């Protein structure tokens, strides 16, 4: 179901309540990474250039339902003011009479930042009265926070019940376009790269994508659960013993659905989980007892690269190894580079948030792929084929 976006509405003379994702890292009261604030600028500027005023709301951190001074959104408001080149008023709270009066006094072009939503436990509980109080501040609701779209909270889902119109901002629109198009109408060959430590976190994604993709490339520690299920010795590698049957059934399903399901042929082994560990490369049938696999090997990296550069649509979710340690980052960096090269050749390449987004940033290639999703959990649930409450609640186009 297509949703209305900010382009379907004129905000002239309107007070617009906008949910943004300003959950940014802070150090000494200043924002250390403003990528999420920059991401919200196009939607904010659309409202202002139409002649409306905008009331922004967000959460930051996990204050557990009470005010925590270090989790104030004031530093985010200050950074936004610098980026917009205009003042941003900071509200003392997100509900209450003082906030209501501040909102009522706004004029076209004004920007007001509400204080951290999660200073109130009612936000995550999706409390109707709390949602109604938030909704009363504006006339139109814009959701531009994809990172929380999989949560039915007061500011993402609840408010939509009390405003006349709820639309998607540019960021959410972009997510729906790329994640949606990639999974619903992919240009083939369609390759999914799945990594990370555990099968349990990716079961639903695997199940959903097996019917849609041409090839699945699997890396990260979850490969060892597949290997053990096939009878290989995996040494001290991470394994989910309670998921061995599941691993077998996924391998079986891949076979019957005609999907090319590629596991590594070699791995980088370490004698301990440490940057200064001794390392060696081994084929998967020669892993010794006291060693653990912490990355895909060079042969696998080349094989995966080949699949990626020949693809027309690629989705990547989860690293190939412990990329935070340089010794075990080569596999992940090789995949990141392959995605950049595939993009140059015209492929649609989508990075599904979370650790893969961090990895592509470490590789310095975030601008060399089609789209880096801003939501870790949200993009995962989207790839699992689930409807996201924050999106479902928006007005249909």
Curated annotation (Swiss-Prot):
Disulfide bonds: none annotated. It catalyses: (2R)-3-phosphoglycerate + ATP = (2R)-3-phospho-glyceroyl phosphate + ADP. It comes from the Bacteria. ATP binds at residues 202, 293, 324, 353-356. Substrate binds at residues 21-23, 36, 59-62, 118, 151. GO terms for biological process: gluconeogenesis; glycolytic process. It is found in: Cytoplasm. InterPro entries: Phosphoglycerate_kinase (IPR001576), Phosphoglycerate_kinase_CS (IPR015911), Phosphoglycerate_kinase_N (IPR015824), Phosphoglycerate_kinase_sf (IPR036043). Pathway: Carbohydrate degradation; glycolysis; pyruvate from D-glyceraldehyde 3-phosphate: step 2/5. GO terms for cellular component: cytosol. Keywords: ATP-binding, Cytoplasm, Glycolysis, Kinase, Nucleotide-binding, Transferase. One of its GO terms (molecular function) is phosphoglycerate kinase activity. Coiled coil: none annotated. Its main location: cytoplasm. It holds the Pfam family PGK. Its EC number is 2.7.2.3. Monomer. Belongs to the phosphoglycerate kinase family. This is Phosphoglycerate kinase.
């Amino acid at each position: 179901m297509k949703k209305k976006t900010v382009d379907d509405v004129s905000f002239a003379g309107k007070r617009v309540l906008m949910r943004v994702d300003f959950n940014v890292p802070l150090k000494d009261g200043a924002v250390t990474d403003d990528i999420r604030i920059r991401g919200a600028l196009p939607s904010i500027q659309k409202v202002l250039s139409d002649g409306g005023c905008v009331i922004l709301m967000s959460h930051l951190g996990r204050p557990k339902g009470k005010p925590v001074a270090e989790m104030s959104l004031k530093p985010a408001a200050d950074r936004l003011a610098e980026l917009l080149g205009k003042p941003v008023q900071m509200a003392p709270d997100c509900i209450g009479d003082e906030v209501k009066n501040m909102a009522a006094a706004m004029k076209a072009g004004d920007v007001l930042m509400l204080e951290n939503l999660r200073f109130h436990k009612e936000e995550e509980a999706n409390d109707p009265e709390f949602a109604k109080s938030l909704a009363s501040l504006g006339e139109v609701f814009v959701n531009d926070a994809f990172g929380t779209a999989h949560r039915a909270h007061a500011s993402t889902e609840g408010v939509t019940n009390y405003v006349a119109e709820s639309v998607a901002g540019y960021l959410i629109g972009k997510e729906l376009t790329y994640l949606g198009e990639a999974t619903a109408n992919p240009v083939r060959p369609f390759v999914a790269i799945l990594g990370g430590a555990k099968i349990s976190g990716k079961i639903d994604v695997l199940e959903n994508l097996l019917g849609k993709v041409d090839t699945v490339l699997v890396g990260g520690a979850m490969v060892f659960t597949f290997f053990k299920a096939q009878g290989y010795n995996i040494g001290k590698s991470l394994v989910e013993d309670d998921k061995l049957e599941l691993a077998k059934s996924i391998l079986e399903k891949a076979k019957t659905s005609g999907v090319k399901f590629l596991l590594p042929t070699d791995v980088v082994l370490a004698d301990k989980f440490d940057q200064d560990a001794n390392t060696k490369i081994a084929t998967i049938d020669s892993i010794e007892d006291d060693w653990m696999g912490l990355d895909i090997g060079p042969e696998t990296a080349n094989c995966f690269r080949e699949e990626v550069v020949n693809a027309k649509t690629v989705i990547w979710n989860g690293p190939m190894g412990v990329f935070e340690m340089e010794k075990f980052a080569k596999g992940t960096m090789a995949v990141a580079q392959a995605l950049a090269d595939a993009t140059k050749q015209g492929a649609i390449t989508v990075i599904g948030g979370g650790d893969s987004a961090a990895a592509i940033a470490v590789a310095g290639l975030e601008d060399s792929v089609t789209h880096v999703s801003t939501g870790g959990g949200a993009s995962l649930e989207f790839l699992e084929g689930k409807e996201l409450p924050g999106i479902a609640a928006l007005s249909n186009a």
